[in-house]
UniProtKB/Swiss-Prot annotation:
One of its GO terms (cellular component) is mitochondrion. One of its GO terms (biological process) is lipid metabolic process. Its EC number is 2.3.1.13. PANTHER family: GLYCINE N-ACYLTRANSFERASE-LIKE PROTEIN 3 (PTHR15298:SF6), L-COA N-ACYLTRANSFERASE-RELATED (PTHR15298). It comes from Homo sapiens. It holds the Pfam family Gly_acyl_tr_C. This is Glycine N-acyltransferase-like protein 3. InterPro entries: Acyl_CoA_acyltransferase, Glycine_N-acyltransferase, Glycine_N-acyltransferase_C, Glycine_N-acyltransferase_N. The gene is GLYATL3. The keyword Transferase applies. Belongs to the glycine N-acyltransferase family. Keywords: Acyltransferase, Lipid metabolism, Transferase.
Length: 288
């Protein structure tokens, strides 16, 4: 195991990962954030350098952590040789097996290999698989012709809005998610539409892997074109900063899939896999 701390080498790694799209997108997004101030306190672990076969991004060991916060305790994985990834999994100090955590990636063997090692350590593992999408370059000029009604007030979220997002996110509703969302809003780009009272009615945020997520419109404000406006604006904002505009969508989320198709988003050949690993000590907790 090698922790890559050199800023020059991290920039080189970023370029190397770009040549491995789309499977490397999650790790690439995390490395881009590391190279641009590292607001989420991440670090990179590899099997070797420069001819690596597996690379993992994780929370810095010195960063404050909550053992129940799998949102923040998230690892992104990319490998050229799955055996190298398994070897890193089996090393004692790459993953923190005493806490609830996530593993994210875009490669098909990720679940089976992770499950085999997790089972040997008596951890429960839960898989959720998504369609992975990528936005083509978005015009710098916003098109609002599709909006229905008055032009909305388009702005960004504040930490004060974290509670609303926590309550409306299917993955949320708990203290850990509330804190995580507040950190995402503080660290990364977001977009929202606000009503005449200044309250958010439609929004999307960016996560620690530079992925667009939690796109949501309050039910009473749907069918006005807000979701489309928010998605295009956030994609444009990410692209203007040099980030790929990527996202994930569940197979049964037909409304979001239809929206993405109307935006000409590219559905990638690989799928996004999110694994949540839970030690037996915490297995009875309801929000996990």
């Amino acid at each position: 195991m090698l922790v890559l701390n050199c800023s020059t080498k991290l920039l080189i790694l970023e370029k190397m990962l770009k040549s491995c799209f789309p499977e490397s997108l999650k790790v690439y997004g995390a490395v881009m954030n590391i190279n641009r101030g590292n607001p989420f306190q991440k670090e990179v672990v590899l099997d070797s350098w420069p001819d690596f076969k597996a690379v993992i991004t994780r929370r810095q060991r010195e960063a404050e952590t909550d053992n129940l916060d799998h949102y923040t305790n998230a690892y992104a994985v990319f490998y050229k040789d799955v055996r190298a990834y398994r070897q890193l999994l089996e090393e004692c100090d790459v993953f923190n097996w005493d806490q609830v955590f996530q593993i994210q990636g875009l490669q098909s063997e990720l679940y089976d290999v992770s499950k085999a090692v997790a089972n040997s350590k008596q951890l429960n593992i839960k898989l959720t698989s998504f369609k992975a999408v990528h936005f083509s370059p978005v015009s710098s000029l916003p098109d609002t012709s599709f909006l229905k009604g008055p032009s909305p007030r388009l702005t960004y979220l504040s930490v004060a809005n974290a509670d609303l997002l926590n309550r409306t996110w299917s993955r949320g509703g708990n203290e850990q998610c509330l804190r995580y969302i507040a950190n995402l809003i503080s660290c990364f780009p977001s977009v929202c539409v606000r009503d005449e009272k200044g309250n958010p009615v439609s929004w999307s945020i960016t996560d620690q892997f530079a992925t667009m997520c939690h796109g949501y419109t309050l039910p009473e404000h749907r069918r006005k074109g807000y979701s489309r406006l928010v998605a295009l604006t956030l994609a444009r904002k990410l692209q203007s900063r040099g980030f790929p505009s990527q996202g994930n969508v569940l197979d049964d989320n037909t409304a979001s899939i239809s929206l993405l198709k109307s935006l000409h988003a590219e559905f990638l050949p690989c799928r996004f896999h999110r694994l949540i690993l839970t030690p037996a000590t915490f297995s009875g907790l309801p929000h996990l």
